[in-house]
């Protein structure tokens, strides 16, 4: 579970101690975290009205985005080059909890998260 320390208006690497991953993951020397198993999820608290992630994907994967326990939607991850993807925006002010969960089987793609940015 994520700790109570939230980040705001800054970028943090995926391996930050305030970001927790559940499932089989590979932590990289550059601060990125990769995974391909269905059901793997990342959870963290953040302060702000939006959150984005810098990701890459070997193949194609779908992830469900939950904010404060509510399913916000499903996002498609594609593209081998790192790029930014908005996970949620137009949220109320304050601290929120993000949960991003892979819902695609591993043979369809391997996801890598480099960082998160809250705004």
Model-derived regions: residue spans:
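Bacterial N-terminal signal peptides
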Residues: 1-2
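N-terminal secretory targeting modules
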Residues: 5-119
